[in-house]
């Protein structure tokens, strides 16, 4: 994950292929916080195939905010919304209508698609039309079509790409639970 975070500086598009329980949502949450606290004005929007997926990222954001050494400021609501100022906020949502993505314009716009393999190309294109300064897509490479597949394969030259293997997570490497909630050695054995 460290190499992914380092690659964000100066990147325009980042695609992360990952297995289940490998830390994608943890990573996305830290990127959201970093983005808003290092730029002003700044807007971060994130979406996914379901509101539940959006709320998982939000839960990770709230946990990171709670565990921060110093208060991060702003107002963090129960819904996926963190507001530092009128022109400095993070908002997560899921929609079945691509046109509802419109309206979030900012010179420092970060757009994230979590579980991107489950989001259709129309939603991806709606996000692109916002002109994000940085676009991050994360997901399980489960399908042989769609924008995530294209980013990882035929359009790879337009993206900074990364892979997080479940086999590289601390719990699997150390064969014990180091980080609760991540893939475990037992999980890997069960799937053989």
Where are the language model's segments positioned?
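Phosphate/NTP-binding elements of NTP-utilizing enzymes
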Residues: 1-192
């Amino acid at each position: 994950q460290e190499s992914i975070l380092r690659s964000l500086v100066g990147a325009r598009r980042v695609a992360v292929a990952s297995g289940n329980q490998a830390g994608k949502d943890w990573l996305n949450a830290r990127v959201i916080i970093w983005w808003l606290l290092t730029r002003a004005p700044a807007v971060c929007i994130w979406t996914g195939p379901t509101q539940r997926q959006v709320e998982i990222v939000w839960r990770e954001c709230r946990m990171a905010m709670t565990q921060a050494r110093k208060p991060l400021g702003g107002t963090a609501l129960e819904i996926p919304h963190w507001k530092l100022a009128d022109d400095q906020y993070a908002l997560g949502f899921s929609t079945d209508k691509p046109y509802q993505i419109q309206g979030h314009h900012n010179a420092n716009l970060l757009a994230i698609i979590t579980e991107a393999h489950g989001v259709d190309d129309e939603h991806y294109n709606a996000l692109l039309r916002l002109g994000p300064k940085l676009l991050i897509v994360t997901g399980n490479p489960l399908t042989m079509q769609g924008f995530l597949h294209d980013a990882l394969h035929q359009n790879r030259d337009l993206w900074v790409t990364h892979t997080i293997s479940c086999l590289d997570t601390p719990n699997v490497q150390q064969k014990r639970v180091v980080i609760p909630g991540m893939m475990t050695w037992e999980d890997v054995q069960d799937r053989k």
